[in-house]
């Protein structure tokens, strides 16, 4: 979407695209990226960032934390982190899901130490990608366009100094459902318009609602709009076909994430001289 808007504003010759897969990336993501770039007629490059991540210890640090929880984890295994709690009440917590080479899955609640290490290690991916973004921006004397939508930006679903860094963020005021609608309006390929939002960070398939949000994005958009427009939990419950208690839980989760991630968008603290 951001690439398409950039082309409309500046023309295809002034837009440059980057596809930055690594060894855990889905091949579908790279293929959709190529399809979009070719549809828009922009120049693009593909860089495999796996060697850089390997050198930084991204995979090693992640796997060490996983093995402290699942000692059998090793070569050929797959993984992802999922959030538990949702709208059913109680405190949200994270679980590690692993799959053996034979296809058997198991899940285990993640202790805080291991959760933080896994997330810190995987955040290398977004930060290395942003380093590549700014290398090419400097090389071309271009600006870096950020991609967070309103839901992601409001709820802190980005990595500080990673995918959260950009010179402009043209869709940060748009709900995710609006982004999809605009993509269809602009005639972007069906593979883009129909793609399910995914973090594409872990080796097992993972939707954004599994990892971070309490509900699928279409429902989260409604909830965020309702909260910002002063609608009661009872009104939200009717719209989302859930109980008022569940709707209140969604509101509480939105507010909690705002508090917990406020620092991500904060400017550095400057001390008086």
What are these regions (language model features)?
Residues 21:
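Acidic, Mg2+-coordinating phosphoryl-transfer loop and its flanking beta/alpha structural elements
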């Amino acid at each position: 979407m951001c690439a398409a808007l950039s082309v409309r504003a500046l023309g295809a010759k002034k837009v440059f695209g980057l596809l930055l897969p690594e060894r855990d990336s889905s091949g579908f993501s790279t293929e959709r990226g190529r399809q979009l770039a070719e549809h828009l007629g922009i120049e693009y490059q593909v860089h495999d960032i796996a060697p850089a991540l390997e050198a930084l210890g991204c995979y090693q640090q992640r796997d060490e934390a996983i093995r402290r929880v699942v000692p059998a984890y090793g070569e050929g295994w797959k993984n992802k982190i999922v959030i538990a709690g949702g709208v059913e009440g109680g405190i949200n917590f994270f679980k590690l899901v692993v799959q053996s080479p034979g296809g058997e899955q198991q899940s285990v609640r993640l202790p805080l130490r291991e959760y933080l290490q896994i997330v810190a290690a995987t955040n290398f991916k977004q930060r290395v990608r942003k380093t590549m973004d700014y290398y090419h921006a400097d090389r071309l004397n271009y600006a870096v366009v950020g991609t967070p939508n309103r839901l992601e930006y409001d709820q802190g679903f980005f990595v500080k100094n990673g995918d959260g860094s950009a010179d402009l963020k043209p869709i940060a005021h748009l709900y995710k459902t609006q982004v999809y609608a605009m993509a269809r309006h602009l005639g972007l390929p069906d593979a883009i318009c129909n793609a399910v939002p995914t973090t594409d960070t872990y080796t097992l398939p993972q939707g954004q609602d599994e990892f971070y949000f309490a509900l699928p994005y279409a429902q989260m958009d409604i909830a965020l709009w309702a909260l910002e427009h002063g609608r009661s939990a009872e009104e939200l419950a009717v719209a989302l076909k859930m109980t008022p208690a569940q709707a209140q839980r969604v509101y509480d989760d939105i507010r909690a994430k705002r508090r917990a991630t406020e620092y991500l968008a904060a400017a550095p603290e400057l001390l008086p001289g």
